């Protein structure tokens, strides 16, 4: 029986305006582009690192 992949749900709470281009690219990598948008992603160390990089403009909603 295969394990279900863990997921993490994030929401963009801040604007990407006047942010460094690497932070904007990170938001695109997280599938976010506007305030209030949510994205459900696999819970991997890479995704966790991306969230940590833009933690001031995103919020973790749910971890399953």
Curated annotation (Swiss-Prot):
Q: List the GO biological process terms.
A: translation
Alphabetically sorted, this entry's keywords are: Ribonucleoprotein, Ribosomal protein
The record's listing under Gene3D superfamilies reads:
Ribosomal protein L30, ferredoxin-like fold domain (3.30.1390.20)
Domain of life per record: Bacteria
Do you know which InterPro entries this protein is assigned to?
Answer: Ribo_uL30_ferredoxin-like_sf (IPR036919), Ribosomal_uL30_bac-type (IPR005996), Ribosomal_uL30_ferredoxin-like (IPR016082)
Q: Which GO terms describe its molecular function?
A: structural constituent of ribosome
**Cellular-component GO terms for this entry:** large ribosomal subunit
Q: Does the keyword Ribonucleoprotein apply?
A: yes
Annotated region (Disordered), positions in chain: 1-22
Its quaternary organisation is: Part of the 50S ribosomal subunit.
Write out the similarity annotation.
Answer: Belongs to the universal ribosomal protein uL30 family.
Name assigned to this protein? Large ribosomal subunit protein uL30
What is the originating organism of this protein? Nitrobacter winogradskyi (strain ATCC 25391 / DSM 10237 / CIP 104748 / NCIMB 11846 / Nb-255)
């Amino acid at each position: 029986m295969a394990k279900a992949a863990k997921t993490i749900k994030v929401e963009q709470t801040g604007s990407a305006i006047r942010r460094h281009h690497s932070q904007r690219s990170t938001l695109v990598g997280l599938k976010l582009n506007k305030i209030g948008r949510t994205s459900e992603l696999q819970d991997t160390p890479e995704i966790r690192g991306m969230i940590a990089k833009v933690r001031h403009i995103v919020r973790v909603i749910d971890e399953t």
